[in-house]
């Protein structure tokens, strides 16, 4: 899910971009990443960038609760339509991930799927995520980011300034693993590679 600043909320940002995001995230190529990530959550769950709530169907029915945060009122309205179809409590908050209105150490699992690429200040957001995560909690994520090959990196760097303007702030070239570790997290499991369904600058997941 993409996250963008209020100043990006012109007609395109408020009405067209949410539809584009929802249609993109509903593509079958993204489903395995979303299902695997959300399906591993447990206990009290916080989803950063819940968007239209597509991940709600992938959570295990035995989880305690899901709190979903997103800055887009338009996408959250779509998420509310999906809440009735799940068997666990869901709380939806219109808020920035850089300033979470949540208590310290209050979640067992935090989930992000295709969100960190578009958070305006990912360093601050990750520190906030660490603040609200319990000491033994888990951060589960599926993200796209900077490729390891220099020729692909070159194109990611060239495309990103334009892409982020039309893609809700999405950066193709963020070093996701570096950002997460810089916030104090320890990476226990990480798999990454190029996906076949999109050009390489867009598909290093």
Region roles according to the model:
Residues 123-135:
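A short glycine-rich, Lys/Arg-flanked "PGG" loop and its adjoining helix->strand segment in the class I
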Residues 2, 10-28:
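Class I SAM-dependent methyltransferase Rossmann-like catalytic core
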Residues 98-110:
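A short acidic, Gly/Pro-enriched loop at the edge of an enzyme's catalytic core
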Residues 46-48, 52-99:
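Class I SAM-dependent methyltransferase SAM/SAH-binding core
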Residues 21-27, 142-202:
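C-terminal alpha-helical "lid/dimerization" subdomain adjacent to the S-adenosyl-L-methionine
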Residues 42, 107-108, 185:
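Local beta-strand N-terminus motif with an aromatic residue
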Residues 108-121:
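A short SAM/SAH-binding and catalytic strip from SAM-dependent methyltransferases
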Residues 24-44, 54, 58:
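Conserved alpha-helix/loop element of class I SAM-dependent methyltransferases that forms part
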């Amino acid at each position: 899910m993409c996250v963008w600043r209020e100043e990006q909320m012109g007609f395109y940002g408020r009405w067209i971009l949410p539809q584009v995001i929802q249609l993109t995230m509903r593509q079958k190529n993204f489903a395995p990443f979303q299902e695997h990530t959300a399906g591993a959550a447990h206990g009290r769950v916080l989803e950063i960038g819940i968007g239209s709530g597509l991940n709600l169907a992938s959570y295990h029915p035995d989880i305690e609760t899901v709190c979903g945060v997103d800055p887009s009122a338009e996408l959250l309205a779509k998420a509310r339509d999906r809440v009735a179809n799940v068997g666990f409590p869901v709380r939806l908050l219109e808020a920035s991930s850089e300033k979470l209105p949540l208590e310290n150490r209050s979640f067992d699992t935090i989930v992000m799927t295709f969100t960190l690429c578009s958070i305006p200040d990912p360093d601050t957001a990750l520190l906030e995520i660490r603040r609200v995560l319990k000491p033994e909690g888990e951060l589960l994520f599926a993200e796209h980011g900077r490729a390891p090959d220099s020729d692909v990196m070159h194109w990611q760097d060239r495309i990103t300034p334009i892409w982020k303007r039309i893609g809700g702030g999405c950066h193709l070239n963020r070093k996701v693993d570096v950002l997460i570790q810089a916030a104090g997290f320890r990476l226990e499991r990480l798999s990454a590679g190029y996906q076949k369904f999109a050009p390489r600058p867009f598909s290093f997941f």
